[in-house]
Swiss-Prot record:
Belongs to the frog skin active peptide (FSAP) family. Esculentin subfamily. Pfam families: Antimicrobial_2, FSAP_sig_propep. One of its GO terms (cellular component) is extracellular region. This is Esculentin-2ISa. The keyword Secreted applies. Its main location: secreted. InterPro entries: Antimicrobial_frog_2 (IPR012521), Frog_antimicrobial_propeptide (IPR004275). Disulfide bonds join 72-78. GO terms for biological process: defense response to fungus; defense response to Gram-negative bacterium; defense response to Gram-positive bacterium; killing of cells of another organism. Expressed by the skin glands. It is found in: Secreted.
Length: 78
């Protein structure tokens, strides 16, 4: 019974803390009207777009190198 009380007290304590943290974040978002969130999304989308571009370029170059190597081996010019 003692361990059950202990675990319930721990769950209540953690729930109270998480609820207060959520309330603080909500109040902070209300004060600045979500401007920080928009900046984070803008930066993330910029990084995501750059990563896609780099991946696409690297894959294209790797494909060219692979095709050139295959053509070289097929024609025995290596």
């Amino acid at each position: 019974m003692f361990t059950l009380k202990k675990s319930l007290l721990l769950l209540f304590f953690l729930g109270t803390i998480s609820l207060s943290v959520c309330k603080q974040e909500r109040d902070a978002d209300y004060e600045d009207k979500g401007e920080v969130e928009e900046v984070k999304r803008g930066i993330f989308s910029l990084i995501k777009g750059a990563a896609k571009l780099i991946t696409k370029t690297v894959a294209k170059e790797a494909g060219k190198t692979g095709l050139e190597l295959m053509a070289c081996k097929v024609t025995n010019q290596c």
